[in-house]
């Protein structure tokens, strides 16, 4: 089967001209992290790259579906769905798509003063675990947004926007836990405040026969939602918690 570098149906591929990259590397505002090129290859069948001398940039590859592999320092690594890796600059490497389950990848070549530090922090194949707060869709949407901007032109403002924004994208890979919590910290704080209100209401009703229905009704929630939220935040069913409060009071 033929080996293909690019040209996949539905692909996106943008490479900045040499002079644009040089200008960015000499611009103190963005010089520490500069995008060379970015792209998206969906269902990249027969994708294969062999760089015997490496390349002049660092390379981030994020597999969002399917499977691929890469070889670095004589070791072969498998790259499953929702995993990413970074290849260092100037080092021989090969990478490609699985023959049986071709990968879908977002990728970016980048350079600058921070590039080596970023690469050193993100070695090997790194998972992006799925959970309710994974924000995988947010990261992909941001990749697509940067590709849109890359396609829109090479004026200074556009290039600066891409390079400054790329810092945020890299941060989402470097600090996955923080990236996830950033979006949900407000709702977490709101839930904590709600629990304090609920327990205060319980305290005021220790002499009464409070029911889950009455508790939920007081806050305008359904009984099932009230139960789930309270249990999630405290580890106790609401009425069991209320019973413990009564026992402690006695």
List PLM regions with ranges.
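N-terminal regulatory/effector-sensing and dimerization cores
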Residues: 21-23, 30-125
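Basic/polar phosphate-binding segments, predominantly the helix-turn-helix DNA-binding elements
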Residues: 197, 201-247
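An amphipathic alpha-helical interaction segment
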Residues: 108-109, 113-117, 121, 131-203, ...
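Short, hydrophobic secondary-structure boundary micro-motifs
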Residues: 71, 96, 158, 181-185, ...
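A short, N-terminal "cap"/entry segment at the start of jelly-roll beta-barrel domains
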Residues: 1-34, 51, 128, 149, ...
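Residue-level marker of regulatory loop/turn positions in helix-turn-helix DNA-binding domains and
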Residues: 27, 52-53, 187, 191, ...
């Amino acid at each position: 089967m033929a080996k293909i570098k690019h040209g996949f149906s539905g692909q996106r591929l943008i490479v900045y001209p040499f002079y644009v990259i040089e200008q960015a590397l000499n611009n103190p505002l963005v010089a520490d992290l500069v995008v060379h090129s970015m792209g998206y290859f969906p269902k990249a069948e027969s994708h294969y790259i062999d760089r015997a001398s490496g390349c002049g940039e660092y390379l981030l590859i994020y597999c969002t579906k399917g499977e691929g592999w890469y070889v670095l320092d004589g070791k072969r690594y498998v790259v499953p769905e929702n995993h990413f890796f970074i290849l260092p600059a100037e080092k021989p490497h090969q990478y490609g798509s699985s023959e049986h389950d071709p990968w879908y990848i977002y990728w970016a070549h980048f350079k600058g003063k921070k590039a080596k530090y970023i690469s050193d922090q993100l070695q090997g194949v790194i998972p992006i675990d799925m959970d309710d707060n994974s924000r995988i869709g947010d990261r992909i949407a941001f990749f697509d947004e940067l590709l849109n901007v890359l396609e829109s032109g090479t004026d200074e403002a556009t290039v600066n926007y891409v390079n400054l924004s790329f810092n945020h994208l890299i941060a989402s890979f470097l600090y996955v836990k923080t990236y996830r919590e950033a979006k949900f910290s407000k709702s977490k704080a709101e839930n904590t405040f709600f629990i304090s209100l609920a327990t205060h209401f319980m305290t005021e009703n220790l002499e009464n026969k409070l029911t889950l229905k009455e508790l939920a009704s007081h806050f305008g929630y359904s009984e099932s939602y009230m139960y789930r939220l309270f249990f999630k935040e405290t580890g106790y069913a609401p009425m069991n918690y209320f019973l413990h409060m009564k026992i402690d009071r006695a």
